[in-house]
Amino acid sequence: MAGDLTPSLFLKYGFGGALSCSITHSLVVPLDVVKTLLQTNPGKYTGMMNGFSTVIKEQGPSGLLQGLGPTAVGYALQGFLKFGFYEVFKKTYADAVGEKADQFRIPIWLAASATAEVIADIALCPNEAVRIRLVAEPTFAKSPVEAFGKIFKQEGVLGFYKGLPPILLKQVPYTMAKFAVFEFTAENVYKGLAASGKPKESLTDGQKLSVSLGSGIVAGIVAAIVSQPADTILSKINQEKTDGGVVKAIGNIMRRLGVRGLFLGLPTRCFMVGTLTAGQFFIYDGIKQMLGLTPAKK
C-alpha cells in the first residue's frame, strides 16, 4: 500500500485524478450525448450511428458537444475527490486491518473505492443534472450557467440532487468494479510477467503504462455492465417529475422500461466506458510517475 499520506500527497493524487477524469470524460462527450439520447428518447434514435447522424442533421456538429462545460468541471472535481480519497481510504482501511491487509486487499479496494465515490458524487451531482438536461432538452438553456439558474429557480437546491440516488446506484458499483478489477488485473499481469522472467522492477515506465491501459479496458467493460441499469435510470429521472419522491420516480421508471429497457445503450456505453477507464488509469499512473508517487499497485 502507499506510504504515509500527507496533505501534499493527497493534493497530488487528487490532481492526477482531476486531470484524468476531466480529460477523458470531455473527450467522450459526443458518445455520451448519443448514449443519453438513446436512453431518454429511444423511439427517435435507432442506434449509435443513427444518433450521431440525427444530432448533426438537426443541431449541427456542435450538438455533439452539448454539456461539455458541466462535464469538464464536474468530472475534474469528482476525479480529484475520487482518486484522492481512494488512496486515503485504501491506506486507512489497510492500517485498520493490520498484518492481514494483503490477504484482504480485494475487500479493502472495494471499501475504499465505495467510500471515495460517495464523497465525489455529492460534488458531481449538480453538474450531471445540468449536463443531462442540456443534452436531453437542447432548448432548455443557452449555456450551463443559464441551466443552473433555471433549475434552481424552478426546483430549488433539491433539483440538482434528485439524481443523487441513481448516481450513487450507478457510480458506487461502477467505481468498486473499476478499481478492484483494475487492481486485480494489473496485479495478475505483473505476476505473469514476473513468472516469465520480467519482474515489474525491470519494466520501463512505458511498459507499466501499457499494463495500466490494458487493465483499464478490462475494468471499464466490467464496470459498465455492472452500472448500466442505474445509468439508464439517471438519464430518465432528470426528465421525470418527482413530486411523489425520488424513490417512487425510480420505481416508475423501472416498471415502464423493464429489464431490457434498463440496458438501452449498453454497447455504446461499454465502448465509451472501456475507453474512458483505460484512458483514466493511463493518465493517472502517468502523472504519478512524473510526480514520483507510489504506484497504485504494490
From Swiss-Prot:
TM helices/strands, residue ranges: 14-34, 61-81, 106-126, 163-179, 209-229, 263-283
Residues in compartment: Mitochondrial intermembrane: 1-13, 82-105, 180-208, 284-298
Location in the cell: Mitochondrion inner membrane
Keyword annotations: Membrane, Mitochondrion, Mitochondrion inner membrane, Repeat, Transmembrane, Transmembrane helix, Transport
GO annotation, biological process: mitochondrial phosphate ion transmembrane transport; phosphate ion transmembrane transport; phosphate ion transport
UniProt xrefs under Pfam families: Mito_carr
Membrane-topology annotation of the record: Multi-pass membrane protein
PROSITE patterns documented for this protein: SOLCAR (PS50920)
Gene Ontology molecular-function annotations: phosphate transmembrane transporter activity
Source organism superkingdom: Eukaryota
Renumbered ranges of Solcar repeats: 8-92, 104-188, 207-290
Gene Ontology CC, one term: mitochondrial inner membrane
Residue ranges annotated as Mitochondrial matrix topological domain: 35-60, 127-162, 230-262
Role according to the record: Mitochondrial solute carriers shuttle metabolites, nucleotides, and cofactors through the mitochondrial inner membrane. Transports phosphate groups from the cytosol to the mitochondrial matrix. Phosphate is cotransported with H(+).
UniProt similarity note: Belongs to the mitochondrial carrier (TC 2.A.29) family.
Protein name from the UniProt record: Mitochondrial substrate carrier family protein N
